[in-house]
């Protein structure tokens, strides 16, 4: 899956947002590549390949582009997947389960500006979750950036969620988790909008310390760049800065 780019042209998934108000009626989903260097990360230069589009809080249309590809890295002997909109994490968790990198009842360490836990009564059955094709369709044509975690909990791949969204959450993590041994049932789910300029009041080194501690404990890592919520060049810059010493 994700072995060929495509457009979503119907009012589903993230394309549902303000669909009737937008002149552009399609969103671009790139293909994934295996990357060995951060130098392979390239920004999108095709203006027709919009990653996310909606009206912002000032009611102005915000058109957002991402990178040319999704990227799969091997870092410190574990897999890290980098992509744009956060609901894609849902697919990659199930892909990792199918490859026996993870199994069920994982603890999700969710580091993000937003909770992503809206419950919109979207459910994937246990039988359908074993089909990557059905998981792919559910991810790309049903879920959106706000509601992908609850269906994963209902199905069982995620058991509990640790929400890290502010300074207190970061400090609580260090107090409660940093001294614990590595756990084979942890997924790190990082949104780089945690580094958006409006959150600069949260200490960068504190963010980095928690992210790297969670990274070391996790069996699998999903990272999104959230084009609607943070400048993409800033997001990639922070991604590189945090993980530069982990790349194999």
PLM segments and residue spans:
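Conserved alpha-helical scaffold segments that buttress catalytic/binding sites
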Residues: 2-248
């Amino acid at each position: 899956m994700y072995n060929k780019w495509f457009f979503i042209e119907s009012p589903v998934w993230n394309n549902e947002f303000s669909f009737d108000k937008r002149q552009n009626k399609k969103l671009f989903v790139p293909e994934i590549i295996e990357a060995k260097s951060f130098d392979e990360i390239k920004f999108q230069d095709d203006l027709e390949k919009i990653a996310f589009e909606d009206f912002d809080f000032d009611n102005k249309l915000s058109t957002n582009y991402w990178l040319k590809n999704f990227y799969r890295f091997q870092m410190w002997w574990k897999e890290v997947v980098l992509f744009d909109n956060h609901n894609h994490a849902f697919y990659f968790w199930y892909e990792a389960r199918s490859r026996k990198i993870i199994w069920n009842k994982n603890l999700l360490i969710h580091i993000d500006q937003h909770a992503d836990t809206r419950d919109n009564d979207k459910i994937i059955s246990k039988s359908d979750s074993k089909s990557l094709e059905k998981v792919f369709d559910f991810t790309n044509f049903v879920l959106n950036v706000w509601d992908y975690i609850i269906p994963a909990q209902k199905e069982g791949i995620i058991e509990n969620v640790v929400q890290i969204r502010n300074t207190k959450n970061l400090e609580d993590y260090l107090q409660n988790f940093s001294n614990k041994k590595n756990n084979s049932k942890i997924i790190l789910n990082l949104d780089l909008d945690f580094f958006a300029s409006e959150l600069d009041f949260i200490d960068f080194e504190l963010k980095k310390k928690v992210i790297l501690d969670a990274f070391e404990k996790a069996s699998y890592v999903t990272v999104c760049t959230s084009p609607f919520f943070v400048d993409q060049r800033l997001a990639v810059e922070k991604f590189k800065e945090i993980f530069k010493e982990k790349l194999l």
